[in-house]
Amino acid sequence: MSLFRGIRTASILLTVGTLIFAATDALAASAPMSVSQLMLYQGADRETILVQGAKKEGQVVFYNSHTWFKAVAQEFEKKYPFIKVAEWRAEGADVMKRAVEESQAGRFLADVVESTAGNIGGIHSNGLLQEHRSPELRFFDDDVTKKGKSGVYYWADRETYISLGFNTSHIPAAEAPKRLNDLLDPKWKGKMSLAGGGTAARWVGAVVEMAGREFIEKLSVQNINVHNLSGAALANLVVTGEVPMSPTIFDSNIFVAKRKGAPVEWRPLDPVVANVGYSGILAKAPHPHAALLFIDYLHSKEGQQFIVKGGLSSPRDDVESLVNQKFKKTYFEAKYSVEEYEKKLSEWEELIQKVLVRRR
């Protein structure tokens, strides 16, 4: 009898222990997660948790620097009608400035920020971005993510490419340059222009890193006009024919103009500079559940397809962009820190002034 009694006692103790562990697990599962835990959570119930939390939050505040995000925000609201997207848009430098100044003032208003490399990098270097994970990350190459210990701080959501744009009324496609060395042909003397500021500097930097400073020296005899204009503004001059061609034109500007019937073409001449927009979640985001849902949607196949409709290219592996991307891309932000990149930009801008402007 004592043997059976012992077995029964052990069985009861085992059952009680199992119940205690089960109860402990249930309490752990139901316990609220910290924001940092939520940002890295990848459980099967992640979507449910985010939706429940977002319904209570009711909105996501999105600071960005590109007009096309309005369409993405509208589609997001259709999918999640209980979340209102409050959008603030400005130049990239102003997005960074506002995010930093609000943080310094203890005003935490924004959830998600989006801008190009230097600006998003500046926000990150101030310690303002939250490391996070997303099921969509598997569709993005490491070159377009800023990795942390367990997730990413920011990752690409759009790309445009800087290379040759030309007016076909002045330069037939069959005659236009097809390789970088073709720009040295004497027949292009006086017909080429560069944009101002960082757009031209990045192109010159890519050329220097691939072909050496000597190529820029050779290019100087072509009497290149350097305009104090953005890439988009210079593209408008290509559209009108005032500028026959330029190797510092964004593909997106040409594709949008071409849709409207303009006689223009864009051609990738290696190396092609990738101009990348990145997005991240602020560490003090007031609506963390909605922020994660938004960043998921922005990088989802559906969200990226809306980006492409706006004339941009997608860094996502399974989304087809407007331009055949079988060309060498230069990602400066993957090669240099923010500080190194700023130093390089200054060097390249000085090279433009010294070799292409002052020698004319």
For the regions a language model picked out, list residue spans one by one.
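Periplasmic-binding protein-like
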Residues: 139-142, 160-161, 188-195, 199, 218-221, 225-228, 298-320, ...
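Extracellular/periplasmic bilobal clamshell ligand-binding domains
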Residues: 321-360
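Bacterial N-terminal signal peptides
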Residues: 10-25
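A bilobed periplasmic-binding-protein/Venus flytrap-type ligand-binding module shared by bacterial periplasmic
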Residues: 163-170, 275-290, 306-307
